[in-house]
Amino acid sequence: MNDFDECGQSAASMYLPGCAYYVAPSDFASKPSFLSQPSSCQMTFPYSSNLAPHVQPVREVAFRDYGLERAKWPYRGGGGGGSAGGGSSGGGPGGGGGGAGGYAPYYAAAAAAAAAAAAAEEAAMQRELLPPAGRRPDVLFKAPEPVCAAPGPPHGPAGAASNFYSAVGRNGILPQGFDQFYEAAPGPPFAGPQPPPPPAPPQPEGAADKGDPRTGAGGGGGSPCTKATPGSEPKGAAEGSGGDGEGPPGEAGAEKSSSAVAPQRSRKKRCPYTKYQIRELEREFFFNVYINKEKRLQLSRMLNLTDRQVKIWFQNRRMKEKKLNRDRLQYFTGNPLF
């Protein structure tokens, strides 16, 4: 610690920014030292300091009372009567705090009132969040029965206590303490999951076909729809109305959603082409993208299709080829390797 020694020797003549104290006490000889009075409460700490003997540790600096009335502000550790109360009478306010851990009586009263208020608030919160003690937990935590289940006794004890942690409020998810927010929230109250409507009775296949006023895209007695196996991949009504995946995607999505919502069919089943028909049509498309009427009639007779089916298949196949060419062009132009 030679820095402090150097500071003490040259502090009166020069300014040293690296020193803690560079003002000589001889410059202020007329002013009394503010640390002249003895320490009233010395704070000691269990750990030892490793500093030099002439350097005072920071944690052991005495806390002095500057301008405070000792009788008015008793210390916390001085619950021994007149020594902390101040004066020779020994009956100051500090002497009355000995029974309350060193606090004055008004401090003890305030602390007791605060503790009572906190205990009352905690008890109110527990009453609001916890279920009443008189109810059975199987009534509170009863699991919802499945929609299609037959009425009868519950299957096993799983429905008795499915959730043992908190009572479920009216919203079905959060505890009962959150019901106040749902009461103040705008909009209709939470109604819970609604059971799906019962499905309509399925109609027989023959009645659905006869009752449909429209004929399919492959209409005609000699259509191969009757020959197609049900396990074959459906590609659209003769791929003429839907094409080989060429119909607009919005229309296909609407058809899927309508078929999912309404259980009864409002149109005939979209029958796919057989592999033989697709192979012959693709072979003709490879040689002639646009087919003339004679070749179209010849194909329709050979494949047992209608003239309209062959015409619409070629239209959709041209649109598919156009899309494939566009995607191919984007791939090759966007790829820096080509």
UniProtKB/Swiss-Prot annotation:
InterPro entries found in the cross-reference section: DUF3528, HD, HD_metazoa, Homeobox_CS, Homeodomain-like_sf
UniProt keyword Phosphoprotein present: no
Pro residues bias spans: 186-204
SUPFAM superfamilies: Homeodomain-like (SSF46689)
Cellular component terms (Gene Ontology): chromatin; nucleoplasm; nucleus
Intracellular or extracellular location(s): Nucleus
Composition bias, Gly residues: 239-250
GO molecular function, one term: RNA polymerase II cis-regulatory region sequence-specific DNA binding
Residues in the DNA-binding region annotation: 266-325
Domain of life: Eukaryota
Any single biological process term in GO: branching involved in ureteric bud morphogenesis
Pfam families assigned: DUF3528 (PF12045), Homeodomain (PF00046)
Sequence segments annotated as region (Disordered): 179-270
PANTHER family reported for this sequence: HOMEOBOX PROTEIN HOX-A11-RELATED, HOMEOBOX PROTEIN HOX-D11
Family: Belongs to the Abd-B homeobox family.
Listed name of the protein: Homeobox protein Hox-D11
Organism name: Homo sapiens (Human)
Upper lineage: Eukaryota, Metazoa, Chordata, Craniata, Vertebrata
